[in-house]
Amino acid sequence: MEGERKNNNKRWYFTREQLENSPSRRFGLDPDKELSYRQQAANLLQDMGQRLNVSQLTINTAIVYMHRFYMIQSFTQFHRNSVAPAALFLAAKVEEQPKKLEHVIKVAHACLHPQESLPDTRSEAYLQQVQDLVILESIILQTLGFELTIDHPHTHVVKCTQLVRASKDLAQTSYFMATNSLHLTTFSLQYTPPVVACVCIHLACKWSNWEIPVSTDGKHWWEYVDATVTLELLDELTHEFLQILEKTPNRLKRIRNWRACQAAKKTKADDRGTDENTSEQTILNMISQSSSDTTIAGLMSMSTSSTTSTVPSLPTTEESSSNLSGVEMLQGERWLSSQPPFKLEPAQGHRTSENLALIGVDHSLQQDGSNAFISQKQNSSKSVPSAKVSLKEYRAKHAEELAAQKRQLENMEANVKSQYAYAAQNLLSHHDSHSSVILKMPIEGSENPERPFLEKPDKTALKMRIPVASGDKAASSKPEEIKMRIKVHAAPDKHNSIDDSVTKSREHKEKHKTHPSNHHHHHNHHSHKHSHSQLPAGTGNKRPGDPKHSSQTSTLAHKTYSLSSSFSSSSSSRKRGPPEETGGALFDHPAKIAKSTKSSSINFFPPLPTMAQLPGHSSDTSGLPFSQPSCKTRVPHMKLDKGPTGANGHNTTQTIDYQDTVNMLHSLLHAQGVQPTQPPALEFVHSYGEYLNPRAGGMPSRSGNTDKPRLPPLPSEPPPPLPPLPK
């Protein structure tokens, strides 16, 4: 079988004598005329293929069918404009891109008679064209002996350029030359695809003044492609190729790329409007670098102009064309962008169109070198992943960056310290804001207005609150001011409210502990971490919500135990959140708490759900859409001046009288009609929160406050100052 195939393949390679004695020559066509007809047919096939949106591989296959057909038949008997549509119709089916017969006929008519309207499909002329095309397809099949599998040089070009690790420019140019060889020459009838590929690479090296070094084995690169190739043969064929390019008239050099023309019309690209002369001049300049030969110069102008004139087309060869297609795509893009359309020699025009075509076409060859070239380009273009998001950026991006920020916080121990200090500062600020807000509480009439404020961005909320509390702008409030407020606190009210809230939080905590304490605490720990990250980020909803509920709790304590208990019970019925968050919220959002206290006293019941507002449940409000800008603004104030006082109150918490706390919790639970919870969980919470959950620790600290009306002492060593936040 292999021997038969080789014999069949040899059948389609002809000597110079056979080419000079072709049927068309015998019927009186001179050599130049016959070559011109072949180039015109190739141009028509290229134009039709692009309009039909078939791959460059299909177009190249149709061109080879045409060349072989006219080695058996004459141009005088079968007009090139009739054979070309039939050859493309057949090649499209062979390459598995079949097109409707009606579509092929209409496209052929549009290419040959652009000024005329499309034929009526019911007219006699159209039906006659259909019959002629089908008959011609049958004649082509019989003439070719049903040998429809075509090997193209593009595959070998890609393989060789990959083997020698040629530059992208060299690979693209070589691939382009392979397409030109099909469009402009009869090399496909004289030499095997590997030989043609060597000629194309050699021509590209000469043209661009490149040189491929000898291998470590002492062999030249072409010996790895085809053992029969010699340097003399390459020089001879290169010279012949250049001569053909020089002889090709400009009208054939200019590839009529329909797709490119349409794109040019739509985009009105300026670079495509540049003069033909300019492009040719550029090509000549490039050629002069490699050689002063007039033939080389002609080749250069041809190839360059063709590349510039070509528009994105499909990849050019079957397998090889597919591999080359990638290279050609790169080449086509570069050339097209840099140069306007020019008159190209037919081969050049085809090359360029082919390169453009490569952009849209699949080729098995692309798996070879083209893929490599494309992958290199893609790799280089890939952007480096962005660095960890900074706090400012995170705040700006809000929720989108939340996940990344959470991961960062989990992975960085430094965040733990910052959280610790942050919680302590929040505690102090909470006390401060609590007293100030309580003083001004009467200003706000109803709870409803308050909630919108809380839900609005924190900055707005701060503005609302601060005018009420102290008349200062949220953003403008400074650490010094905060200190002053703390000193001026109304000790009795504030402490009472704090104590109540502490006991409530304690109560909630115990309750949660009695429930799957381990699982809940782990969840709390993670949520706590995230909530911390969220606060700076300004995206978390949990925190703001927590403060509100927690503040409400404290407010209730202010008003009455019964009211607070009823409220807490109602609120707890919402989703249960980590208790830590509640405690943290109390500290973090003092202003909010105070405000909520005021609002709760006025219209408390309608908005709140049922269930004791315990620390664990304070996170229930985490679902609420409170924006954290206020947290952001407040954070800098608290953090700047306040060290981790009792680090979330952990240090103070340890001094709490256990029995008193338990008794208080029992009494509160009984008031609410709930059974007291198990004490052991409480101890676990203390240790856990102390080491893992600074925020949880805040809750115990609160209970500690219950025993001690005084504010927790500031830490001996304040935490390092945090970077200033954006205003």
Swiss-Prot record:
Give the Gene Ontology MF terms in alphabetical order: 7SK snRNA binding; cyclin-dependent protein serine/threonine kinase activator activity; molecular condensate scaffold activity
Main localization of the protein described in the UniProt heading: nucleus
Biological-process GO terms, alphabetical: cell division; positive regulation of DNA-templated transcription, elongation; positive regulation of transcription by RNA polymerase II; positive regulation of transcription elongation by RNA polymerase II
Q: Give the residues annotated as coiled coil.
A: 386-427
Q: Which spans does this entry mark as compositional bias, Basic and acidic residues?
A: 486-508
**Post-translational modification summary for this protein:** ADP-ribosylation on serine residues by PARP1 in response to DNA damage disrupts the phase separation activity of CCNT1, thereby preventing activation of CDK9.
Q: Where is this motif: Nuclear localization signal, and interaction with Tat-TAR RNA?
A: 253-270
Question: Region Histidine-rich domain (HRD): which residues?
Answer: 482-552
User: Which residues are recorded as modified (ADP-ribosylhistidine)?
Assistant: 489, 532, 558
Phosphoserine PTM sites in chain numbering: 117, 390, 497, 501, 566
According to the UniProt record, list the residues that bear N6-acetyllysine: 392
Q: Where is the composition biased (Basic residues)?
A: 509-532
Protein family (similarity comment): Belongs to the cyclin family. Cyclin C subfamily.
Role according to the record: Regulatory subunit of the cyclin-dependent kinase pair (CDK9/cyclin-T1) complex, also called positive transcription elongation factor B (P-TEFb), which facilitates the transition from abortive to productive elongation by phosphorylating the CTD (C-terminal domain) of the large subunit of RNA polymerase II (RNA Pol II). Required to activate the protein kinase activity of CDK9: acts by mediating formation of liquid-liquid phase separation (LLPS) that enhances binding of P-TEFb to the CTD of RNA Pol II.
**PANTHER family assigned:** CYCLIN (PTHR10026)
Q: What is this protein called?
A: Cyclin-T1
Q: Whose protein is this, by species? A: Equus caballus (Horse)
